[in-house]
Amino acid sequence: GKKLNVYLGIDPTATKIHLGNAVALRKLQQLVGLGHNVTFLIGDATALIGDTSDKYNERPVLTPEEINENFKNYKNQASKILDFSKVTIKFNSEWLNKLSFTDTIKLAQNFSFGDFASRELVKKRLADKKRVGLHEALYPAMQGYDSYFLDTDIQIGGADQTFNMQAGRILQKNLRGKESFIIVTGY
């Protein structure tokens, strides 16, 4: 059959991957075994933004050195499940850092701030008068652009990433006229 473009993206915002990542990594390895084109994406640029999916507070800003050190730890841990000799490793700074302001605005036009603001943790932060940075609202669009840039057929991620992965589907459909799919693992 057709070889699919598949990816799993992880922002290196902590020193260790969590147990829930093992499920997604095992699924990725299964797809490697089936001969698909698999990318392990390191969200070094999106790690600078901070994902609101599971956070009540803004994430602390990491240095590029901290992000790189975390990536090394992630790869070492993930290699116990994923055969990296058959996987492409990419860093999303390769394309996100090249987007112009105009490019970013055009991407943002595909999304509604209302959809972002309706997410449970964002609603709670707003109700509690806690700061929600505008940069955080751009996070789903940037993760979605990862999917678009990699021309993915399937994106794998945890349940906490469903909203962000849907952004990739939106961009694939709106900008490429292509249906893409997500596999949601249960963490």
Region annotations inferred by a language model:
Residues 2-52, 155-162, 168-169:
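N-terminal catalytic cores of NTP/NDP-binding nucleotidyl/phosphoryl-transfer enzymes
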